[in-house]
Amino acid sequence: MSGSQTLVVKLGTSVLTGGSRRLNRAHIVELVRQCAQQHAKGHRIVIVTFGAIAAGREHLGYPELPATIASKQLLAAVGQSRLIQLWEQLFSIYGIHIGQMLLTRADLEDRERFLNARDTMNALLDNRIVPVINENDAVATAEIKVGDNDNLSALAAILASADKLLLLTDQAGLYTADPRNNPEAELIREVHGIDDVLRGMAGDSVSGLGTGGMATKLQAADVACRAGIDVVIAAGSQVGVIADVIDGTPVGTRFHSLETPLENRKRWIFGAPPAGEITVDDGAVFAIMERGSSLLPKGIRSVKGDFSRGEVIRIRNLNGRDLAHGVSRYNSDALRMLAGHHSQQISEILGYEYGPVAVHRDDMIVS
């Protein structure tokens, strides 16, 4: 593909360590070399790196990964500076400056903070600086749980208005079955839409060092593809993998983006981590899915979590299936009071009103 491209490369702990308990510096050196090669050709490279906990564990000599959040945050605090120092040293060999962006998912929940992060990303890229994005594991808690690494990578790709997102992992891509247990498993080369059948094929990482599995990579691919970003899942050990993705050479599993991507605001809605969730009845499901309607309080059965007006929430049916993400017009306490009631009763129940709908269709993305 001709012309400059923006590529986000996500490097999980299993890739950075090679499955061991220590950072695999030789492997990291090779990945930096590949990134520098593409940077020299005029492409814009963004690194999303994890492994702060692994780096801290190596430095302090912890034989086992601790179970408590506080202990993991201790390791992250020690390892974060060592990890970014390593990236800086390696990129400086090629005369490339890096800029660290420490994020938590909370930084992306708020629309204004999201835009500020996007402006910072663009400023770095415009000045030929490679953004190196880390989770702020030393202060965050949700980020240490399974799945956030891959989903944060998709959000980083949205921030960068990337052309492609490369998720490097310890497998060659998405298989029809777990290749570790099934010798007949086949690599899926092309994906044009993520459905339940595809999700059923996803297995989990067994490295014990990272927090992401193949299922969460599918979630990240879904978010990025809806935003108009192609996604490739490939092995971090694949020779020349970064050049292959830039050039369009078949490698790993490629997820094709939507031909009509979401507009910028809806990219944020779909990508933002939900602050809570609501369960709706079958009537509301029909109205949302078949009629393209807004969600009214009458259709709400239950509310989970504590969230404010204007935050993104998840909408689910009675079976727990995700239907949509949307911006709530009311806070969680208000929606609990309004659940099952007609819109005409809102003022009577609350003493105020922000309109007749709980989530407006214009502020909703159907899954």
Curated annotation (Swiss-Prot):
Reactions the enzyme catalyzes:
L-glutamate + ATP = L-glutamyl 5-phosphate + ADP
Q: Where is the PUA domain?
A: 275-353
InterPro entries per the UniProt record, alphabetical: AceGlu_kinase-like_sf (IPR036393), Asp/Glu/Uridylate_kinase (IPR001048), G5K_ProB (IPR041739), Glu/AcGlu_kinase (IPR001057), Glu_5kinase (IPR011529), Glu_5kinase/COase_Synthase (IPR005715), Glutamate_5-kinase_CS (IPR019797), PUA (IPR002478)
Q: Please indicate if the UniProt record lists Lyase as a keyword.
A: no
The EC designation for this entry is 2.7.2.11
Kindly state which keywords UniProt assigns to this record, in alphabetical order.
Amino-acid biosynthesis, ATP-binding, Cytoplasm, Kinase, Nucleotide-binding, Proline biosynthesis, Transferase
The entry marks the following residues as binding ATP, namely K10, T169, D170, T211, G212, G213, M214, A215, T216, K217
Q: Could you tell me the superkingdom of the organism this chain comes from?
A: Bacteria
Quote the subcellular location field of this record: Cytoplasm
Instruction: Say which enzyme class the record assigns.
Output: transferase
Alphabetically, the GO molecular function entries are: ATP binding; glutamate 5-kinase activity; RNA binding
Sites binding substrate sit at D137, N149
> Which coarse location class applies to the principal site listed for this UniProt protein?
cytoplasm
Q: Pfam families, from UniProt?
A: AA_kinase (PF00696), PUA (PF01472)
Q: Biological process GO terms, please? A: L-proline biosynthetic process
Which pathway, metabolic or otherwise, does it act in? Answer: Amino-acid biosynthesis; L-proline biosynthesis; L-glutamate 5-semialdehyde from L-glutamate: step 1/2
Its Gene Ontology cellular component terms are: cytosol
Could you list the residue ranges forming a coiled coil in this record?
A: none
Q: Which HAMAP family match?
A: ProB (MF_00456)
Q: Which family does it belong to?
A: Belongs to the glutamate 5-kinase family.
- Per its database record, what is this protein's job? Catalyzes the transfer of a phosphate group to glutamate to form L-glutamate 5-phosphate.
Q: What is the official name of this protein in its record?
A: Glutamate 5-kinase
